[in-house]
Amino acid sequence: MAHGGDYRQWPFLTTEEFELVCAFFDQKYVKAELGPTRKIFKIRLRRTLTTGSSYIEILRLLHLPEENDDLSLAFEKLNSGLDGPGVDVDMLTAAEDADQEALRPQLQNQHGGAMDSGALPRYSLHSDQPYVTYEVHLHPTYNMPTLWFTLHDLPMGEPTFNLESVYRYLVPPEYKSRLRATGFTGGISAAPHPVTDVPAFFIHPCQTKEAMESFDCTMANYLMIWLGMVGGCVGLWVPPEMAAEEA
């Protein structure tokens, strides 16, 4: 099968190819006419200072606040703190700066070297809203994108690194029995985070190759196709506006 993108070995990605597909995905978000969706769904292209590698970060509220003021507080008053020696670089583009709707929160680093007690992004004291952070990293062994995810600020002090919390807050009902039957191989797995080394959940990439082989897509659409396959089982759907073809 001929593929539009210039891949070295489809559907695997080299480090350079992963950088490109991440950049294309970020630009789709920046240019898409998302309207109010931008207030509850944030995508950022980031780069770690420790390794220089790129990754995609996606921030989503688990529940929409009833009041608009609370929604604004939840996303616009993140405690960014001061960037320290281990912070990652937020790769904002000039195109996004021109987008009046793209009010992306300035998150404190999660992925540097030495981390202080305030390293994880938290909402302001005025608006504690539970949320999930998804990250797309290149797996060093499978050479495929891998979806990592962490829960934050759950109500009543519920544990965030807990498989039952994942099923309660992220996994749609139609996926629960299938994921539980799959187990840790090919389903939801847990391991040290690829950057922080802190335990985190991820979707095991062992079956991604077979799923991607049936598609023919350019690098510009690689992550759109990939997330369409792996994201839904943990509550991640890419806004359809991002799939619109540019004029």
Where are these regions (language model features)?
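Extended, low-hydrophobicity segments enriched in charged/polar residues
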Residues: M1-V132, H139-Y142, L154-E246
